């Protein structure tokens, strides 16, 4: 499928919208009331430091809603305002934050149901309004909705669209796209649908496995078993790893994406020589600025003397998980929570350890003066961060009184 031609056709359709409906000022006031925080504004103005009693808060200097998320949520709100009586669907969570998605449900935005792991679009009718989330949607979903005569509101983050352009460039010159990401993440599913031949690698370890196969060959069956869910139909590692281009899920760790790109570059130089590198390797910078800023801020924060870290964001949020990884790699006890409701009753916290299911920790807040690092993922409103801080302050005041 010529995905570029399809996008041009879709974008010129009168049923396609991605720039809002003229309700920006009204919606902006609504979003400020629902998601912004006066406390967080005060902490920012105070040099990202705050002390209450014997609790010192150190806030990362970049955290929370990014521009792409703000844009997506605002456009979803505008859609409801512009289509007050129409049936509105969304193909997936608008962002990975439970409170924001619940708010859309309260606004009568219906989520496409998933049956046996597959989205069921049978309930969508011609004339229905369908929102594409910030992560984007696969080209096949867009095609289905367009052919069904739906009004499509596209909130895809421009940084995600930039990655789509990169894999389309790979496809145009018959390069295989090596995508650093999670094969079952909505963004990577969408990105791979715009690629030609592709292989998805989760981390540097998997990238090394692939590069070793490029240099030395190996067990083809074992390779295919390892990447069975992470490659394009008909993928052949002996045929499809001769010319490769690098792309990434925008929320992955910046440093790891760069390492993977350099690893494949070195591998192709070793295999084919430096003079022929451009025949076998290409790479475009598709690392999201907002992701990079939040990771850089976290790397600065963990250099401070912190007793523990609280990372706030959806449990299925990739960028939030990577912020937690940074804390753990620097030896700081870290608690990943998705809302203030995870704290209490008493000195307990329900949190999600890295790559594990949620669990409960008792007596997580030490009974002494403490310094707590705070950050939040790109899908987390400031209001949620405020609620977490107030819960911590309330818990410490109760502990002090007792």
UniProtKB/Swiss-Prot annotation:
Please tell me where (2E)-4-hydroxy-3-methylbut-2-enyl diphosphate binds in this chain.
96, 185, 250, 317-319, 379
Q: Which cofactor does it need?
A: [4Fe-4S] cluster
Q: What pathway annotation does it carry?
A: Isoprenoid biosynthesis; dimethylallyl diphosphate biosynthesis; dimethylallyl diphosphate from (2E)-4-hydroxy-3-methylbutenyl diphosphate: step 1/1; Isoprenoid biosynthesis; isopentenyl diphosphate biosynthesis via DXP pathway; isopentenyl diphosphate from 1-deoxy-D-xylulose 5-phosphate: step 6/6
| Keyword Nucleotide-binding listed | no
GO MF, one example? 4 iron, 4 sulfur cluster binding
Task: Please give the InterPro entries that the UniProt record associates with this protein.
Answer: LytB/IspH
Amino-acid positions noted as binding dimethylallyl diphosphate in the UniProt annotation, renumbered to this chain: 96, 185, 317-319, 379
Q: What is its EC number?
A: 1.17.7.4
Q: Which domain of life is it from?
A: Bacteria
Any one Gene Ontology biological process term? terpenoid biosynthetic process
Q: Tell whether DNA-binding is among the UniProt keywords.
A: no
Extract the Pfam families matched here: LYTB
Xref: NCBIfam families: ispH_lytB (TIGR00216), PRK13371.1 (NF009911)
Q: What is this protein called?
A: 4-hydroxy-3-methylbut-2-enyl diphosphate reductase
Source organism of this protein record: Thermosynechococcus vestitus (strain NIES-2133 / IAM M-273 / BP-1)
The lineage, from the top, is: Bacteria, Bacillati, Cyanobacteriota, Cyanophyceae, Acaryochloridales
């Amino acid at each position: 499928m010529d995905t570029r031609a399809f996008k041009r056709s879709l974008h010129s359709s009168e049923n396609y919208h991605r720039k809002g409906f003229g309700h920006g000022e009204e919606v902006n006031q609504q979003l400020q009331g629902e998601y912004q925080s006066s406390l967080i504004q005060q902490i920012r103005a105070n040099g990202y430091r705050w002390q209450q009693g014997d609790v010192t808060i150190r806030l990362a200097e970049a955290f929370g809603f990014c521009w792409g998320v703000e844009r997506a949520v605002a456009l979803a709100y505008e859609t409801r305002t512009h289509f007050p009586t129409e049936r509105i669907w969304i193909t997936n969570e608008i962002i990975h934050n439970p409170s924001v998605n619940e708010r859309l449900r309260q606004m009568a935005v219906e989520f496409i149901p998933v049956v046996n792991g597959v989205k069921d679009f049978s309930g969508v009718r011609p004339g229905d309004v369908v929102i594409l989330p910030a992560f984007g949607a696969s080209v096949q979903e867009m095609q289905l909705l367009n052919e069904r005569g739906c009004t499509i509101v596209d909130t895809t983050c421009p940084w995600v669209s930039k990655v789509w352009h990169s894999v389309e460039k790979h496809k145009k010159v018959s390069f295989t796209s090596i995508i650093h990401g999670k094969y079952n993440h909505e963004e990577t599913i969408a990105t791979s649908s715009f690629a030609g031949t592709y292989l998805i690698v989760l981390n540097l370890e998997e990238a090394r496995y692939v590069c070793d196969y490029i240099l030395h060959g190996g067990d083809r069956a074992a390779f295919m078993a390892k990447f069975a869910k992470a490659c394009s139909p008909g993928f052949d590692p002996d045929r499809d790893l001769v010319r490769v281009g690098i792309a990434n899920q925008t929320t992955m760790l910046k440093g790891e994406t760069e390492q993977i790109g350099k690893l494949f570059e070195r591998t192709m130089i070793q295999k084919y020589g430096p003079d022929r590198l451009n025949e076998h390797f290409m790479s475009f910078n598709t690392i999201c600025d907002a992701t990079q800023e939040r990771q850089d801020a976290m790397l600065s924060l963990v250099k401070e003397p912190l007793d523990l870290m609280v990372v706030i964001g959806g449990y299925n949020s990739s960028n939030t998980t990577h912020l937690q990884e940074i804390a753990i790699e620097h030896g700081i006890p870290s608690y990943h929570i998705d809302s203030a409701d995870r704290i209490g009753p008493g000195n307990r916290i329900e949190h999600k350890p890295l790559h594990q299911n949620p669990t409960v920790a008792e007596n997580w807040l030490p009974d002494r003066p403490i310094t707590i690092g705070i950050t939040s993922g790109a899908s987390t409103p400031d209001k949620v961060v405020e609620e977490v801080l107030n819960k911590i302050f309330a818990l410490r005041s109760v502990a002090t009184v007792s």
